[in-house]
C-alpha cells in the first residue's frame, strides 16, 4: 500500500438563494484561505451554487445548472489555478430535465472526476429534487480513493458502507446540517464503523426559515474528530490526512472491520423492501395501550467477586421492578469478559443448568430473558444467545461474527444467519457481542421485523457505546437493549436506546454510564414507536433505501481494491 500524507480542508459558509455571483465569490474566498493553509483537498457545502430552500420544483430548476454550468466552470478554474482537488455540493439540472442534489469533485487539472446524486432525500428535498440515480461511485485520485455523499445520505448506514466496501479511503460529505446530532454523532459513527476519513462541510447561518448551526468537521477512521469549525462561524478547518495505513481498520478488540464481515448473512439488505419480512408488518394495526412492555438491561454476570447465582438474583430483582424482558451481558456465566479455552469449555458444560435456572424465573413470572452463553455442538464450542420464556427455550441466535478472542476457542467456522423471534411482547432480535459492531447486523434484524434488539456485550472502547450504540438503534427505529459487562475494558454503561434516540446527540449527557455491577437499566417500550420507521413525514429509514445499489455489501469476497486495504490489518 502507498502511504499518502496531505492537508485537507472543510469550508463552512453560507449560500445566498439565487445569487450565483455571490456564491462563486464566497466559494473562491474560502478556497483561497484553505490553500493558504496548505490544503490539497477542499470540500464546500451542499447546494453551494444556488441556496437550498426553494419556492417550488420550478424555482429549483431555474436555479439549477448542468455540469458544465457557470458554478462548475468556476470550481474547475479554482482547482486548476491552485492545483488542488475540490469538492462541492451542486443543485444540478440533469440532461433528463430533472433537478438533483449532487456532489462534484474536480482534480488539479480542473477535470470533473467525481459526480454523485443524493439518494436519501429528506422531506423538503422530495419537493424539488429527484432521487439520485448514479449509485455509489468511488474514484481513484492521487490522494487516495474518494467517495462522495450528500448530507442526509449519512443518516442511513448503506451509502457510506457501499463507498467503503469499494475501497474508499476518504468520503466527502457536502451537507446542510440542520441539527448538531448529524455532525457530532453520525459523522464520527460512519467514520468509525467503516474505518475511513470523512470530511463534512456544512453551512452556518439563516436561509429563510432554515437555521444552519454549522458543525463542519474532519473525522479520522477511528471516529476521532481531528478538526471542527465552531458553530455559527464561517471559515475553514484544516487537518492532516494520512491514508495507506492500517489506522482505523481494526476494532478495539483487534478484529478487522472488513475481513470479519459475513456477507452471506446480509442478503436481505439488497432485497426490495416490499419483499422483506418487515414490509407487511408495517401495515399491521397495533393497540398502543396494550402493545407495550417494560424491558431492562441487567448488568449482572459471573466475575471474580460474583457467581451466577448472584447474577440470577439480580435478574429476579429486575422482574420485581416490573421488567418482562431481561437482557443479560455477554458470556453471562463466565468469570471473564474474554474467556479462555478452558473458561469456554466450563461455561458450555454449565449452560444447560443456567438455561434451567433462568427458565424457572421466566416460568414463575411469565417473563422473557436472553442468556448469552457458550454451547457445545458437533463442530465444537460456539457463542450463542438463548431466548427463554415461560414454556422454555424459544430459540437460539448463534453469534454471526466471531471476535479474535472467540476464535481462540470456537469450533470450526460456521455460517450463521440472523433470526427474529415473534413473541407476545414483540418481535425480538439479538446481536451478540462482536455482531453489534457491524451496521449490517441491526439492519438485517430490522428488515426481519425486529421491534427490540438485545446487544449482550463486553465493550472494548467507549466509542462503541458513545457512537455506535445510538446509531444502531436510530438507523433502524428500534429499541436496542445494551447489556454490557461490568468487567469489560470499557466497563458497564448498560442502557436501553429508544427508536427515536435521545434529545441530545451526546449519549453520555442523556444516559451517563453506570459502571456498578448489578445495575438494572429499564425502559418502557412502546412497540408502535418501533413500527413507525419515518424520522419525518415521508422519510422512511427502511422503505426509502435503494437496495439495488447495495449489491457490493452482499458480495464475498469484497472487490480486490478493498481487500488490499482490509487484509492489511
Could you describe each region identified by the protein language model?
Residues 2-14, 285-305:
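Short beta-strand segments enriched in small/hydrophobic residues
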Residues 137-138, 197, 203-291, 420, ...:
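C-terminal beta-strand edge segments of enzyme domains
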Residues 16-20, 148-151, 300-307, 430-433:
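Active-site mouth loops of central-metabolism enzymes
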Residues 65-87, 154-237, 347-370, 437-522:
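CN hydrolase (nitrilase-like) catalytic-core segments centered on the catalytic cysteine
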Amino acid at each position: 500500500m502507498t502511504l499518502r500524507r496531505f492537508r485537507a480542508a472543510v469550508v463552512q459558509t453560507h449560500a445566498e438563494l439565487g445569487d450565483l455571483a455571490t456564491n462563486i465569490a464566497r466559494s473562491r474566498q474560502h478556497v483561497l484561505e484553505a490553500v493558504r493553509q496548505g490544503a490539497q483537498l477542499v470540500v464546500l457545502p451542499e447546494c453551494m451554487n444556488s441556496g437550498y430552500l426553494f419556492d417550488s420544483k420550478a424555482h429549483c430548476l431555474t436555479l439549477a445548472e448542468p455540469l458544465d454550468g457557470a458554478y462548475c466552470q468556476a470550481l474547475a478554474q479554482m482547482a486548476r489555478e491552485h492545483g488542488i482537488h475540490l469538492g462541492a455540493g451542486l443543485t444540478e439540472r440533469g440532461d433528463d430535465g430533472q433537478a438533483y442534489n449532487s456532489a462534484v469533485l474536480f482534480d488539479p487539472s480542473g477535470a470533473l472526476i467525481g459526480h454523485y446524486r443524493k439518494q436519501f432525500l429528506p422531506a423538503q428535498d422530495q419537493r424539488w429534487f429527484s432521487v439520485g440515480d448514479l449509485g455509489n461511485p468511488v474514484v481513484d485520485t492521487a490522494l487516495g480513493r474518494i467517495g462522495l455523499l450528500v448530507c442526509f445520505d449519512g443518516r442511513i448506514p448503506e451509502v457510506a458502507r457501499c463507498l467503503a466496501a469499494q475501497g474508499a479511503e476518504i468520503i466527502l460529505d457536502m451537507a446542510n446540517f440542520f441539527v448538531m446530532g448529524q455532525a457530532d454523532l453520525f459523522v464520527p459513527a460512519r467514520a468509525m464503523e467503516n474505518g475511513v476519513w470523512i470530511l463534512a462541510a456544512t453551512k452556518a447561518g439563516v436561509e429563510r426559515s432554515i437555521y444552519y448551526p454549522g458543525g463542519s468537521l474532519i473525522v479520522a477512521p477511528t471516529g476521532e474528530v481531528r478538526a471542527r469549525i465552531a458553530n455559527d462561524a464561517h471559515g475553514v478547518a484544516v487537518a492532516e490526512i494520512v491514508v495507506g495505513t492500517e489506522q482505523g481498520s481494526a476494532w478495539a478488540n483487534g478484529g478487522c472491520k472488513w475481513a470479519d464481515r459475513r456477507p452471506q448473512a446480509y442478503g436481505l439488505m439488497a432485497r426490495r423492501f416490499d419483499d422483506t419480512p418487515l414490509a407487511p408488518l408495517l401495515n399491521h394495526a397495533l393497540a398502543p395501550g396494550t402493545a407495550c412492555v417494560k424491558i431492562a438491561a441487567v448488568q449482572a454476570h459471573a466475575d471474580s467477586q460474583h457467581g451466577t447465582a448472584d447474577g440470577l438474583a439480580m435478574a429476579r430483582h429486575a422482574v420485581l421492578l416490573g421488567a418482562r424482558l431481561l437482557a443479560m451481558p455477554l458470556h453471562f456465566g463466565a468469570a471473564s469478559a474474554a474467556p479462555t479455552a478452558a473458561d469456554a469449555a466450563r461455561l458450555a458444560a454449565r449452560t444447560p443448568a443456567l438455561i434451567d435456572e433462568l427458565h424457572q424465573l421466566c416460568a414463575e413470572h411469565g417473563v422473557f430473558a436472553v442468556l448469552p452463553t457458550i454451547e457445545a455442538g458437533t463442530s465444537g464450542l460456539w457463542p450463542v444467545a438463548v431466548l427463554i420464556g415461560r414454556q422454555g427455550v424459544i430459540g437460539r441466535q448463534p453469534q454471526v461474527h466471531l471476535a479474535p478472542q472467540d476464535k481462540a476457542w470456537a469450533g470450526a467456522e460456521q455460517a450463521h444467519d440472523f433470526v427474529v423471534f415473534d413473541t407476545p411482547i414483540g418481535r425480538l432480535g439479538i446481536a451478540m457481542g462482536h455482531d453489534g459492531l457491524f451496521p449490517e447486523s441491526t439492519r438485517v434484524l430490522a428488515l426481519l421485523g425486529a421491534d427490540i434488539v438485545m446487544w449482550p456485550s463486553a465493550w472494548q472502547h467507549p466509542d462503541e457505546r458513545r457512537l455506535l450504540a445510538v446509531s444502531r438503534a436510530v438507523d433502524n427505529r428500534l429499541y436496542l437493549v445494551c447489556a454490557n459487562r461490568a468487567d469489560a475494558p470499557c466497563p458497564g454503561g448498560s442502557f436501553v436506546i429508544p427508536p427515536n434516540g435521545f434529545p441530545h446527540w451526546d449519549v453520555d449527557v442523556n444516559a451517563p454510564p453506570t459502571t456498578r455491577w448489578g445495575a438494572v437499566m429499564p425502559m418502557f417500550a412502546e412497540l408502535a414507536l418501533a413500527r413507525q420507521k419515518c424520522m419525518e413525514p415521508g422519510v422512511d429509514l427502511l422503505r426509502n433505501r435503494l437496495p439495488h445499489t447495495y449489491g457490493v455489501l452482499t458480495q464475498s469476497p469484497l472487490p480486490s481494491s478493498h481487500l488490499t486495504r482490509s487484509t492489511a490489518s
